[in-house]
Every structure is written in C-alpha cells, then in structure tokens.
Amino acid sequence: MANLFKRKPLSLIVSEAQEEGEHHLERVLGPVSLTALGVGAVIGAGIFVMAGLGAHRAGPGLMLSFVLCGIGCTFAGLCYAEFAAMIPLAGSAYTYAYATLGELFAWIIGWDLTLEYAMGASTVSSGWSNYFIEFLKIFGIKIPLWLSYDHWTALTQATHTVAREMVVRAHPEIPVGSQGFLDAVAALLVHPTAQMSSAADTLLAAPRLFGVEIGFNLPAFLIALLITWILVVGIKESARFNAAIVTVKVSVVLFVLIFGSHYVHVSNWGTDWHTFAPFGVAGISSAAAYIFFAFIGFDAVSTTAQEAKNPQRDLPIGIIASLFICTILYVGVAAVLTGMVPWQLINIEAPITHAFLDHNVGWASDIITCGALAGLTSVMLVMLIGQTRVLYAMASDGLLPKKFFAAIHPKFRTPWKNTILVGLLAAIVGSITPIDKIGTMVNIGTLLAFVMVCAAVIILRRTNPNQPRPFRTPGIYFGGRLPIVPGLGILTNGYLMYSLGIWNWVRLIVWLIIGLFVYFLYSIKHSKVQKLANVAEGD
C-alpha cells in the first residue's frame, strides 16, 4: 500500500544536489546572474501596464499598494531563501513540499506551478505581442489584426477601434486616452450596434478556413519559439541573453524615474490622507491584490538551484536582492506616474507612455515601448526556465516519464525534450487563447505555492530542527511554535487568494483534480520514493 504522504528524505535530496556529470545540469550561475534572473522574471507587464488600473483603484496610494505586495512577497521570499540554501535542487516549491509535506502535496504543488510558469509564459507572450505590434508601427509596419491576436481578441480589438473612431468623430473635444474618452468608448461597447459589428468585421478582414474565421497571434507564437530555442542551447547562453535584456529594461525604468521626475507636480499626490488615498485602505488593498501579478516570478530563481555555482550562498542573495530591487523600482515608478498626471486622468491602457505624451514628450513613448518589450521577453525566459526545471525535478523523482522529461542534451546540458514540449505548448496557447482566460489563473496558482512554502518552513523547523541551514528565515521562535514571518506570509498571501473570486478557485480546483488523475494513474506507480519505501518494508 502506497503512502501518499511519504516524504523524500533530506539526505537523498542533498546527495542528488551534489551529483554532477554529463547527465546532470551544469553549474554556471553566480549571485549576479541569479539576481538578474529574478529581476528579469518580475519586472514586466506589471510596471508597464497594470500600474494604470492600480492607480484608478488606489489613487496616489498606489505607492503603498506596491509596498504591500512587496512585503507579502518578501515574507514568502525569505521562506524560499531558507529552502533554496538548504535544499539546492531544481524544483523550487515542489522539492520543498516533497521534503516536508509528503509526495501527494509535492505533486499538487508541482502540478499547480504549471499554472504559474507555463500559463504565465503564454500570458506574457500575448502581452509581448501587443508591444511588438506598437514597436513595428514606429517604422510604419502594420500586421493584420487576424495575425496579431487570437480570433476573439482580434474581433474585440476591431470593435474597440471602431468605437474609438466613433467617439473621436462625435466628441473631438475629449482628449484621447483620458478617463472621459475611455468612459465614452465603454458606453458604446455596452450595446454594440449592428453598424459597429459590421464595421468591425470589415476592419478585421480575417480569412476563413472551413467557413470559420481565422485568428492567430503570430508574434506571440514566434517569440515563444525563439525563447525556447535559446533555452535549449544552454543555461549559460540564456543567462547572458537575460542579463542583456534586464540591462535594457532597468535602464528604461531608470529613464522613467529620472526624466519623469522633472514633470512631477507634488500637488497631484494630494494634500492629506483622503486625497492621497481617495478610496482608503480598502482601495490600497484592492489595488495590491490586482497588481500582485507584477511580483510573480522571483521564486523561479530557486528552480535553478542545480545550476548555481554556490547555491547555499547565492540563491538567498538572488531571491532577496531581486525582490528588494523590484519593489524599490515599482514604488518609484508609481510615485512618478501619479505625480506626472492626476490619478483620475491616468491612461489605463498604456499609463507610462501616455503620461509622457500628456507632457508633449512623444519620443519618450518609443523608448518605453522598447523597455516593455525587453521586460516581457525576460519574463518569458525565466518562466519557461522555471517550468522546465520543475518538470525535470518531477521526472527525476519518477512522477513523470524520466526518459523524456529528465533527458539532458549531451552537448548543451539542458533538459531539451521537455523544454521543446513546454515551449510549443506555451506558443500554441498564447497564440490562440484570449489573454484574460489564462492570466487570472496565474495569480492563484502562484499564491498557493507561496502559502505552502511558508507552511513547509514551519513544519520542517519542528520535524527536523537540527538540519543545517545556511540561511534561516528570521522571525521564527521556540522551534517553530512562534512563526512570525512564515505566519504573516500565509496570512498575506492567503488573503490575496481569497480576494481573487470564486471562479478562479473553481478553475484551480478543476486543474488540481485533473492532476490527481495523472498522479494515481501513473506517478504513484513509478515514484522513486515509493519504490525505496517498498524495498525497505520488504527487508
């Protein structure tokens, strides 16, 4: 009889982490590369897109919303750092759960991480496509709508374009991109007329296949394939590529902070608490729950544990340094954005770009577009790294077919087969699926992983207090009986999970049920830990 909660011995985990050779991952990443991977994973859509919606929920208090998110992620990050230093093995939260909560919980968290990494990469590839299309417009190049989005999004985009043109013609006095303009467009879209629908179909001009209109996000498909190829070639090359991209991205963010500060009017931040936070603490919390996506990705650093030169020292540095850097940059951009433009007038679709356009600095928008492209590219890179390393760890434990998911390329020393599979799936999903259908699942999957890692730290402090810990999560007293930091991590991230709504919970539960079918039909029969336990019982 299999023990569903059989834990993977820490001694076995540590010995596996020390294995080297042509069939194992190559250790080439130092603290700078790991920090760059963390920054690369985090800074992306959140800072270039979601800040606008966050501002309309919190006003200038958006700065505190980013601080709140940063604090919640720091609690989880400190727990990740303890595990990453103690268990330097690819797999991240999956490996940590295996050592503390048992095999079934480990499988659940590994399956859950697919929502964060693979679906996150698909979501970001779609967002990358939007900025790439804007980038091409700088050079006068336009891609047909049906090749720029999935069919549903392309039709929606065409309808929005028609509505915007109608508002421009009917109300030329309303500034394009202002809240009043967006409200007028939204009013038209509530009940689209037959004339609008016909004009949208004409604008879309999509070809038909077997009588069905085609929609295929070609840029999203191609960028996912390009990132996949880079990852197959090698982690060292991927790290160099990511470092270059992160340099560009951070430079653009610093440009926004330095150049944008010249246009800040302190009065836009308000004169008291009520004008600084027009919707109070509730508004700040609501914005924090929404912009949480802006912090997703730092945990991917721990999935590269077997490729770090000195994981016990470098992984905590990479995790904590990347979180600190990103939080500072986010708060700074929020301050500049809400200082440049009154929060009521901040553009929702492209807030930073339009903030400069409002001050007649149009050339800056081109620079920001380049920064957004760089940001989203590095996010995709790190998310795909994270997914492939989790699958590698699960296959090494026998929970997935090892010959495929743990196959290491003899030349590049990367898990090339599962990288190609994950990249293809991410490319296909990102090219044919509306971004809103997959994006909301990413947050809840990530938050579940954070909660379980915080809980696992508490459990391991009590069950294995003498295990060497090169880095210790602070704020844990009396052998784990008073876990202040992990406890706050559970409460903070659990609250954010609660705020995501019932349908996200339903989708998460359905996804986990599918995973349980896979576990009981295949994984439990091939588990390395279960086989070792059976041998021990036989003796």
For the regions a protein language model found, what residue spans apply to each?
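Membrane-interface loop-to-helix entry segments
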Residues: 129, 215-263, 278, 319-323, ...
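Hydrophobic alpha-helical segments of multi-pass membrane transport proteins
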Residues: 134, 252-256, 391, 442-470, ...
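C-terminal membrane-solvent junction of multi-pass transporters and transport-like membrane proteins
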Residues: 212-215, 227, 403-416, 450-501, ...
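Membrane-interface "cap" regions at the ends of multi-pass membrane proteins
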Residues: 1-51, 55-61, 74-78, 87-90, ...
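Helix-loop-helix junctions that connect adjacent transmembrane segments
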Residues: 19-26, 62-63, 142-220, 244-370
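Extracellular loop-to-transmembrane helix junctions
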Residues: 26, 47-160, 322-329, 506-511
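Membrane-helix boundary/coupling elements in multi-pass transport proteins
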Residues: 48, 112-130, 290, 295-308, ...
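A generic transmembrane alpha-helix motif of multi-pass inner-membrane proteins
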Residues: 57, 440-441, 445-446, 478-539
